[in-house]
Amino acid sequence: MTIEVLDRGFVKLLDHMGDDFSAVKAARISHGRDLIDEERDRKLIEYLLRSGHESPFEHIVFTFHIKCPIFVARQWMRHRIASYNELSGRYTELAEEFYLPDLYKRYGERLNENDLQKASKLIEESYKKSHEAYKCLIDMKIPKELARVVLPFATYTQFIWSVNARSLMNFLSLRADSHSQWEMQQFALAVAQVFKSICPWTYESFIRYRYEGDLLKGVNP
């Protein structure tokens, strides 16, 4: 399952371990029980999230492949209860891939046409110059780990993210929210879409009882 985000990014589900029933089994082991029936299992998930008993959801794990601008990745990796492995700019020559924001769509009502054109041109030109400098430094045999210092935060990076459902729900509360940067929001909404497809009962109860953001309430991600 791959969801395209922004102009060049994506959220791709590589693997997952468990689903709604994994949390039910983990919760019922406390009393030496297993799955009972669908309706009671669903109500148990609702009870767990309503009462804040979230440890059973740590047994559901997702592994994603993420491609996003570096400035988004740096916000993402502040969520430390997870595992990350990122594309290395020390060993890999970074592609000429930069996030180009759609200023007209985002700020067309607040900025005049002339300023929007100037801003878009300035961003594109700065990207081009920085990558030209990067390539020149590499051609001069400057190590890639040092040559990359001229590249902007808008450069695309890639990483693998493994996270349990409990931590993922915390991520969504903070990032699928209007207080988060818009670009970060778009990736969080894509993650929410994957989460909902794998764990629909958990997702529904999470939104109802534990979600602290404002972008997912009353909408389908």
From Swiss-Prot:
Pathway: Pyrimidine metabolism; dTTP biosynthesis. Belongs to the thymidylate synthase ThyX family. One of its GO terms (molecular function) is thymidylate synthase activity. Binds 4 FAD per tetramer. Each FAD binding site is formed by three monomers. Keywords: FAD, Flavoprotein, Methyltransferase, NADP, Nucleotide biosynthesis, Transferase. Homotetramer. InterPro entries: Thymidylate_synthase_ThyX, Thymidylate_synthase_ThyX_sf. This is Flavin-dependent thymidylate synthase. PANTHER family: FLAVIN-DEPENDENT THYMIDYLATE SYNTHASE. It holds the Pfam family Thy1. DUMP binds at residues 75-78, 86-90, 148, 175. It catalyses: dUMP + (6R)-5,10-methylene-5,6,7,8-tetrahydrofolate + NADPH + H(+) = dTMP + (6S)-5,6,7,8-tetrahydrofolate + NADP(+). Its EC number is 2.1.1.148. Residues 9-209 form the ThyX domain. CDD domains: ThyX (cd20175). FAD binds at residues 55, 78-80, 86, 164-166, 170. It comes from the Bacteria. Catalyzes the reductive methylation of 2'-deoxyuridine-5'-monophosphate (dUMP) to 2'-deoxythymidine-5'-monophosphate (dTMP) while utilizing 5,10-methylenetetrahydrofolate (mTHF) as the methyl donor, and NADPH and FADH(2) as the reductant.
